[in-house]
């Protein structure tokens, strides 16, 4: 009975304690933080008094002690903010729980093979037996093959040596022999020397500084074996070490031995701690990472990617020179998270000239670690560390004076304070790695994108992987796209890997999209193997995330896309809006590149008939092979026949303005019938191939229509000229045998004097005989005059031979020039017959 009555009160007390914890983090003064910490401890104490569960008692007792200790530290610490904001240093990392498909299992297995080694998915922490020596205790573990060294490194290479060999003969300050250790007390000073892995060293500087600020007593990444009942790394008796790194879609097991490349000179071939020469943890982490990246010849990547692999923390890249980035925004976004230990910060320069490097004291295309952030009296500064051992101790141009921090500890060489505004001015990229534990839920999808079948058009997403993202409660959702690392076959292939770009586009709806137009969010194209999209979405909303690329190697590549959120989130392959998709290929050639609808040759463009038996929604996507071509699509109501001229009443839908990267027509509830699709480039004589995708909700037939001249014999007349005051001319038309004929009259030139003008409205008729008893056999445009830029047409009619006795058959062109007209028109007629026909000379009738 008492348990039932106390439960609500206990729950209420815990809720108040959690609120007090949040108040500690957001406190604006030391006294507010202290009061909130005491409040949290008191509420946990009261909840502890009400519990009867031994498990709950242990948890609540630990929380009481934690917050009492925190309150004492806040009260006695000058840097009370760091203490107050360290609540989230240890959060549970979420994990995807959706069941993988067989194909996804295969993708993860493929990702295990990398650069000649096998890195299986992580299953569990290794047992201590994995690190035991042989029966006699003298068999040390040796990993084969040895990691690759560059030619420069080989010049000073003195062999692979165990830590005790490297430290042989060295003593500490007290004269005692140095023995290798995996943990140290006091601050570290990690640096690179010969190796070009500044990004790796900067990454480890960021993780060690987090521990040194008191946010976590465990170094990241964790190295096994560990000291009993802790996550602190220990010396392996066998020289075997195991790492849990995140890459190629999951956490994986990386195994190395403790042999490191020794040097013939004073230069070091591995990362060192200048404060603790016997601290082997950095060099072993470096070796494990370089193993999966292909060896010690590794040219470097960026520290955001390296930290992602080393820790599994979510990478984000901020372009500091973007117009959207401000010092206020950067500082407000990062300050609290940094001091609570939820984000690791590194930073990189862009390409600098030698003069700029000398004047600024910065290294070109180099990564630095951010060790601390301080704000006092309106001054905001970053503590930055250059991981290169050869750096100078002071940077005259950028070294900030102690200013508001006169009691700052001694800075090691290469470490300096810099104002936030100067950071944005002199660095190019800020790399953030977020603790995934700030989210409660994660869901992953692993997929393959086959880029070997040809490059997709920029802005056309018909072939791109697309995903539906749904959240019931809404709120913050982060989407992380990761490209899987591949084996480096050569330095050239490595360059290909490094210079591809990936991005994420986000649309409403959750269904597949065809073009980039209408995106809610467009991520930047980054040359990293990862990119992050941050969303804030309303409840019960579904979005489409599209994966895009530029210049990736034209091979099949594996990816993982992950969704992170504080509430359950679902991610799946985006369904198509349409049931049936028909793919047709064609091209614009010298005879079919007719240009836009204002061109006289528009009707020559490729045309397609589409037959619909029932009402349906329809999508038509035109994807040219040349991304520089601006294209357009029109859908006509035409009975499925070729379009000879463009009339607005016949247009059902079109793609709008001409655009590069593909064109899209969408129409809802299109009636049954036969329609014609015309695809065009902006200007005539622009050649190239294309793919036409027609998507509907019913089965449909799409066929390319033959050209007007297909199967016909074409004959061109001489050019007939109507001078001012002349409005009618005619030419005889004959055939040796019965045939079907189509006539097309086109303007070749119209002018007033020397000034070009549009053609006069024209009517073309086919007449038997002349004079009062003539007979009209066929006429253009239903008997109306037309100034259509594509010309006027007389559709198919039967032409018989031997009609000369009845006055002959005549092609008659009659224009509306009006009395005193000043226009001079030049016309040409093309006859398309099943048999050859002849067109005689033009006879011009005076007004």
Curated annotation (Swiss-Prot):
Provide this UniProt record's keywords sorted from A to Z.
Answer: Hydrolase, Protease, Thiol protease
Lineage top rank: taxon: Eukaryota
Domain MIT, chain residue ranges per copy: 1-84
Enzyme nomenclature, EC number: 3.4.22.-
Q: GO:BP terms for this protein?
A: cellular response to pH; penicillin biosynthetic process; positive regulation of penicillin biosynthetic process; proteolysis; regulation of secondary metabolite biosynthetic process
Under Pfam families, the record lists: Calpain_III, PalB_C, Peptidase_C2
Q: GO molecular function, one example?
A: cysteine-type endopeptidase activity
Instruction: Report what the protein is called.
Output: Calpain-like protease palB
Protein source organism: Emericella nidulans (strain FGSC A4 / ATCC 38163 / CBS 112.46 / NRRL 194 / M139) (Aspergillus nidulans)
């Amino acid at each position: 009975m008492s348990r039932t009555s106390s439960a609500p009160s206990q729950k209420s007390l815990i809720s108040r304690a959690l609120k007090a914890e949040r108040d500690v983090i957001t406190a604006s003064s030391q006294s507010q933080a202290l009061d909130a910490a005491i409040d949290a401890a008191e509420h946990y104490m009261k909840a502890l008094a009400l519990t009867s569960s031994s498990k709950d008692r242990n948890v609540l007792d630990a929380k009481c002690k934690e917050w009492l200790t925190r309150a004492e530290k806040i009260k006695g610490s000058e840097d009370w903010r760091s203490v107050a904001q360290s609540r989230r240093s240890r959060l549970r990392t979420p994990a995807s729980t959706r069941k993988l498909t067989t194909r996804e299992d295969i993708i993860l297995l493929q990702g295990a093979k990398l650069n000649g080694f096998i890195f299986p998915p992580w299953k569990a922490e290794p047992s201590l037996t994995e690190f035991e020596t042989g029966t006699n205790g003298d068999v040390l573990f040796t990993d084969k093959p040895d990691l690759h060294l560059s030619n420069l490194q080989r010049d000073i290479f003195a062999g692979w040596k165990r830590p005790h060999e490297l430290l042989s003969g060295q003593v500490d300050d007290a004269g005692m022999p140095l023995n290798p250790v995996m943990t140290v007390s006091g601050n570290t000073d990690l640096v690179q020397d010969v190796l070009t892995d500044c990004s790796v060293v900067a990454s480890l500087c960021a993780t060690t500084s987090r521990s040194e600020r008191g946010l976590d007593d465990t170094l990241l990444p964790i190295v096994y074996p560990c000291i009993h009942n802790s996550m602190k790394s220990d010396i392996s008796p066998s020289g075997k070490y195991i790492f849990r790194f995140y890459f190629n879609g999951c956490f994986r097991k990386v195994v190395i031995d403790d042999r490191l490349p020794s040097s013939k000179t004073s230069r070091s071939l591995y990362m060192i701690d200048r404060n603790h020469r016997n601290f082997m943890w950095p060099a072993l982490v470096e070796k494990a990472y370089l193993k999966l990246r292909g060896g010690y010849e590794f040219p470097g990547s960026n520290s955001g990617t390296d930290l992602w692999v080393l820790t599994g923390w979510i990478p984000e890249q901020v372009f500091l020179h973007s117009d959207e980035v401000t010092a206020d925004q950067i500082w407000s976004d990062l300050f609290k998270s940094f001091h609570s230990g939820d984000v690791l910060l590194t930073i990189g320069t862009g390409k600098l000239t030698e003069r700029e490097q000398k004047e600024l004291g910065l290294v070109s295309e180099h990564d630095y670690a951010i060790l601390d952030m301080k704000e006092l009296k309106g001054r905001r500064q970053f503590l930055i560390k250059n991981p290169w051992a050869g750096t100078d101790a002071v940077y005259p141009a950028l070294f900030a004076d102690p200013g508001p921090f006169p009691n700052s500890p001694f800075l090691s060489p290469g470490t300096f304070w810099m104002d936030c505004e100067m950071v944005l001015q002199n660095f190019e990229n800020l790399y953030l790695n977020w603790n995934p534990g700030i989210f409660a839920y994660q869901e992953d999808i692993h997929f393959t994108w086959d880029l070997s079948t040809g490059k997709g058009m920029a802005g056309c997403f018909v072939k791109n992987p697309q995903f539906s993202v749904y959240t019931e409660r809404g709120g913050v959702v982060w989407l992380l796209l990761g490209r899987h690392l591949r084996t480096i076959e050569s330095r050239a292939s490595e360059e290909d890997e490094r210079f591809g770009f990936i991005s994420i586009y986000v649309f409403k709806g959750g269904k597949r999209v065809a073009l980039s137009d209408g995106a809610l969010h467009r991520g930047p194209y980054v040359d990293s193997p990862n990119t992050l999209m941050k969303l804030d979405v309303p409840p019960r909303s579904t979005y489409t995330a599209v994966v895009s690329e530029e210049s990736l190697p034209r091979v099949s590549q594996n990816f993982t896309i992950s969704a992170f959120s504080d509430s359950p989130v679902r991610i799946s392959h985006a369904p198509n809006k349409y049931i049936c998709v028909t793919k047709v290929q064609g091209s614009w050639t010298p005879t079919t590149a007719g240009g836009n609808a204002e061109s006289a040759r528009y009707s020559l463009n490729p045309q397609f008939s589409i037959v619909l038996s029932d009402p349906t929604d329809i999508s038509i996507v035109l994807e040219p092979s040349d991304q520089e071509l601006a294209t357009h699509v029109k859908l006509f109501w035409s009975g499925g026949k070729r379009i000879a001229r463009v009339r607005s009443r016949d247009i059902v839908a079109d793609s709008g303005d001409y655009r590069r990267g593909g064109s899209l027509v969408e129409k809802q509830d299109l009636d049954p019938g036969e329609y014609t699709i015309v695809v065009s480039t902006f200007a005539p004589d622009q050649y190239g191939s294309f793919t036409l995708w027609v998507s509907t909700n019913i089965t449909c037939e799409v066929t390319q229509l033959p050209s007007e001249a297909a199967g016909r014999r074409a004959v061109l007349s001489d050019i007939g000229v109507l001078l001012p005051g002349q409005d009618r001319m005619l030419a005889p038309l004959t055939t040796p045998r019965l045939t079907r004929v189509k006539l097309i009259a086109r303007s070749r030139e119209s002018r007033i004097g020397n000034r070009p003008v549009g053609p006069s409205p024209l009517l073309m008729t086919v007449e038997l005989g002349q004079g009062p008893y003539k007979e009209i056999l066929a006429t253009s445009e239903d008997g109306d005059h037309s100034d259509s830029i594509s010309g006027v047409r007389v559709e198919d009619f039967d032409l018989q031979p031997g009609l000369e006795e009845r006055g002959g058959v005549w092609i008659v062109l009659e224009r509306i020039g009006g009395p005193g007209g000043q226009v001079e028109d030049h016309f040409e007629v093309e006859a398309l017959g099943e048999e050859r026909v002849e067109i005689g000379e033009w006879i011009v009738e005076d007004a």
